[in-house]
Swiss-Prot record:
Protein name listed in UniProt: Fe/S biogenesis protein NfuA
Bridged cysteine pairs (disulfide): none
Named cofactor requirement(s): [4Fe-4S] cluster
NCBIfam families listed in its UniProt record: PRK11190.1 (NF008392), YhgI_GntY (TIGR03341)
This protein's encoding gene: nfuA
One of the protein's GO biological processes: iron-sulfur cluster assembly
Organism classification: Bacteria, Pseudomonadati, Pseudomonadota, Gammaproteobacteria, Pasteurellales
Cofactor binding comment, as recorded: Binds 1 [4Fe-4S] cluster per subunit. The cluster is presumably bound at the interface of two monomers.
Organism: Mannheimia succiniciproducens (strain KCTC 0769BP / MBEL55E)
Function: Involved in iron-sulfur cluster biogenesis. Binds a 4Fe-4S cluster, can transfer this cluster to apoproteins, and thereby intervenes in the maturation of Fe/S proteins. Could also act as a scaffold/chaperone for damaged Fe/S proteins.
Amino-acid positions noted as binding [4Fe-4S] cluster in the UniProt annotation, renumbered to this chain: 151, 154
Length: 194
């Protein structure tokens, strides 16, 4: 795995914090609940006695970052920055693979489609309290989807399916996927977005 990208500004910030700690203290980058929708990334101090034999050490100019073996694959393509905004400065940690491991390009179609749904489509639907689940891919090449949360019973679900989800999936999986179909039994209720 390649090194986690830590900007110069973030490295400077960590160095300042580490200067106030016991000598030999470095940082630990980790993921809590990796591979789940509730995954959260974090950074903590890592004193010398907290380094495990199974940790991966990533060396930077003035310190090292340690990552435990469970978190490691979920931190692939992660970036840490220290951003200055109007309201002050803030440490940002982007880890696109924290919620789900990246799937290989030659993985079965169902795994690749599910990965796109979980990492690209569901985050868009989450603003409406909605989500979709991939049920199966038919022999004819259709992704069978189940809508849940705010999408269930929403009057806009057909538009979301045809113009949003299906279009995105067919473009990404051209030649492999013909379309998407909804098998949800929509029950309109207070949970429905529209």
């Amino acid at each position: 795995m390649q090194q986690i990208q830590i900007s110069d500004a973030a490295q400077g910030h960590f160095r300042k914090l580490l200067d106030q700690q016991e000598e030999g203290t470095n940082i630990r980058i980790f993921v809590v609940n990796p591979g789940t929708p509730n995954a959260e990334c974090g950074v903590s101090y890592c004193p010398p006695n907290a380094v495990e034999a199974t940790d991966t050490e990533m060396k930077y100019a003035t310190f090292s970052a340690f990552v435990d073996e469970v978190s490691l694959p979920f931190l692939e393509d992660a970036e840490i920055d220290y951003v200055t905004e109007e309201l002050g400065t803030q440490l940002t940690l982007k880890a696109p693979n924290a919620k789900m491991r990246k799937v290989a390009d030659d993985a079965p179609l169902i795994e690749r489609v599910d990965y796109v749904i979980q990492t690209q489509i569901n985050p868009q639907l989450a603003s409406h309290g909605g989500r979709i689940t991939l049920v199966e891919i038919t022999d004819e090449g259709y992704a069978i989807l189940q809508f849940g949360g705010g999408c269930n019973g929403c009057s806009m679900v057909d538009v979301t399916l045809k113009d949003g989800v299906e279009k995105q999936l067919v473009e990404l999986f051209a030649g492999e996927l013909k379309g998407a179909k909804d098998i949800t039994e929509h029950q309109r209720g207070e949970h429905s977005y529209y």
